[in-house]
Amino acid sequence: MGCASELTTIDERKLILKGSQKFKPKLFKYFGSEKPYTGETINYFESGKKESAGPFHNGRKNGIWTYWHEPVIRKINVGRIESKGLYKFGMRKGFWTYWYPNGEKKEEGNFKLQERVGRWTYFNEKGEVIQTREF
């Protein structure tokens, strides 16, 4: 009465961090098709404002992507960029910058295989350096 199960090995470096959880990236496909999508995309918040924009190649994020802060009632951050950086084969790579909703720089540094590498610089909401850290 045993249960046979197969174990699948997953390279954690290829997982995408969203919040405090990691997910396996999925291929982005044409609606109603099994063909992976290649081309530019723009995603929108329910308000109609841009949420993210960037290119896909063979179903994976590939190229410079920009993310915007979600608009708020007071409209202090409408249209303000939240982060911008490079994807290669669906994984963050190279230099990335993040901003506070007020438009000041929050942090910047490099990624390799979805992991922070090298020197990262962190800023307060006034744009002043508060910490540097090596990864």
Placement of each model-derived feature along the sequence:
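Glycine/tyrosine- and acidic-biased, solvent-exposed loop/turn segments at the edges of beta-strands
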Residues: 2-135
